[in-house]
Each structure stands twice: as C-alpha cells, then as structure tokens.
Amino acid sequence: LQVSLHASKIDISEELRNNLYEKNSNVILTSATIKVEESFGYFLQRNGLTENDNIITRDYVSPFSYQDQVKYFQYGGSKDITSDINELSDLIYHVHKTFNKRTMVLFTSVRMLENVSKKIKERLGGKKIPLFAQSRGASKPSIIKGMHSNENALLFGTNSFWEGVDLPGELLEVLIVVKLPFDVPSDPLIKSYSCLLYTSP
C-alpha cells in the first residue's frame, strides 16, 4: 500500500509578487477574460497587485464580429442528447454532412468521444471523409496537421483541445460543443475555491 498526499495553495498572490513582479522590471499579463463587470480590480487582487502599484491597464475591443461571422445553433430536443450515443452520433453526422466543412467536436468525456467516434466511422463507411479522434496514440500536433490537409475533416477532441488550438479561417468553420466542461463540485480544490469566492468581500 502506497499513500501520497498532494497540496495546492489557494492564494498564490504573495508568490507572484515575490517571484515574478519584484524580480522583473516589466510584466505583461493578457487575457480575453481579465475584467469582471468592466473592472480589473478582482484580477489585480487575486494576482497580488493593487491600484497603488505602477500598473497600466488597457482594454481593447475585439475586431471579431460575432454578428457577421458566427451562426449559433442549439439542440432543441426534450431530453439530454448526451445520454443517447446513437442520437448524438446521428446529429453530428448530419451537421457535418449539411455543411461539409472542417468540423471540430469537443467532448468532456474520453469514453463518450470513443463511442461516438466508433459510430461515426460506421456511418462514414467508404466515404472519403477523414476522422481524427484524440486518443492515447494520436498526438495533438499530428491531428491538427491532418485538419490542415483535409478540407472536410472531422476532429474529435477533449481535454487539451478545449483551449490553445489555432485553426483560423477555413481551417475550422464548424464547432460542435457536446457538453460544457464544468469542474466536479466535489473536488477538494474546487470546493476550496468556491468557499473563498463566497467569503470574499
């Protein structure tokens, strides 16, 4: 029997100040989600900074026009489609068939990804539509390279594909989100963060 204990600090503001800000003359922090209710205050507080520090904040409007460049569709069925692998697979298949564009499907479960991938492969049969499914044997760079090379490719991803994937323009035109990735509420770290948020002024 082997037992291991793991610890993680909830508040790392002091570490950031001592090891990052005070050891560097210039630090640039960027994100699309830094502001809360049009204020940088919460981000500054959580990251060891105050209004008294020599800070310059800037807010830039995104040049991306959602109204002109995005069409949003939501499944309107009466049940949770993720509970029916066959129906979910049919929906993904028909969406890809309708648009016939490079499509990425994001999952929160590896098992669901594998099950749907198997069903889609059966539906595709001999069609020349490449399907790249994230698995233990496929690397992220090789999957992205495959998307570059095939105009109507299907990409099934989870975990690392939820962020840090750059497929601009025609390299990715259809995105299907099977289920939003919420953290497990019972996770000790998540519970600690939640308590901290509720007790913060």
Q: Where are each of the predicted segments found?
A:
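ASCE RecA-like P-loop NTPase motor cores
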Residues: 1-200
